[in-house]
Amino acid sequence: MKFFIDTANVDEIKKANDMGVICGVTTNPSLIAKEGRDFKKTIEEITTIVDGPISGEVKATTVKAEDMIAEAREIAKIHKNMVVKIPMTVEGLKAVKVLSKEGIKTNVTLIFSANQALLAARAGATYVSPFIGRLDDISMDGLELIRTISEIFATHAIETEIISASVRHPIHVTECALAGADIATVPYSVIEQMTKHPLTDQGIEKFKKDYEAVFGK
């Protein structure tokens, strides 16, 4: 399973990229707004840091297929690695069909059911993004959704990749890998948590003390 980082914070992207663990970035209107920066300038800077798929979403106010298509074409011009995030709606599917034929990569977002994922894949989506944390929030099983989509795609040889989104903690990451997700897009805070274990800290401290006992500080 591959890792993308889910943020528009350039400093976080740099830190994660320096670890050598991420191969892409996902953003959304909320993440861009949180940074208080211009969308295009932010995306352009991100493309100079990570050489991999960069998802930029059409505006939340864009609801008609023709408008999504026009906006997606502009986003795709920013860089060769751009992937356009399109919401899972009827109009969104219409846009994905056209964009796919034009060779523009798409990431259909806000997926909450296997049927939605299947429709998006058949429309030509490069990626689908099921939101597991938000399903967990309403007492549904987000990870079961990943398993179901993965099984359907494998059964029918569907090449659309599954991006596990709304990942809240390291256990989500492990379970997504087991469930068959191709990619997990995670916040920087989760990446940090994944690097840590109390026994690792204890082991490092013991090695340090043992060394200092013999050789001094």
Curated annotation (Swiss-Prot):
UniProt EC number: 2.2.1.2
SUPFAM superfamilies reported for this sequence: Aldolase
Primary localisation category: cytoplasm
Job description of the protein: Transaldolase is important for the balance of metabolites in the pentose-phosphate pathway.
Gene: tal
Domain of life: Bacteria
Record family assignment: Belongs to the transaldolase family. Type 3B subfamily.
Subcellular location field: Cytoplasm
BP-aspect Gene Ontology terms: carbohydrate metabolic process; pentose-phosphate shunt
Gene3D superfamilies attached to this UniProt entry: Aldolase class I
Organism: Brachyspira hyodysenteriae (strain ATCC 49526 / WA1)
Enzyme class, broadest EC rank: transferase
Pfam family, one: TAL_FSA
One cellular-component annotation, GO: cytoplasm
Pathway annotation from the record: Carbohydrate degradation; pentose phosphate pathway; D-glyceraldehyde 3-phosphate and beta-D-fructose 6-phosphate from D-ribose 5-phosphate and D-xylulose 5-phosphate (non-oxidative stage): step 2/3
Residue numbers annotated as active site: 85 (schiff-base intermediate with substrate)
Catalyzed chemical reaction(s): D-sedoheptulose 7-phosphate + D-glyceraldehyde 3-phosphate = D-erythrose 4-phosphate + beta-D-fructose 6-phosphate
Protein name as it appears in the record: Probable transaldolase
Keywords, alphabetical: Cytoplasm, Pentose shunt, Schiff base, Transferase
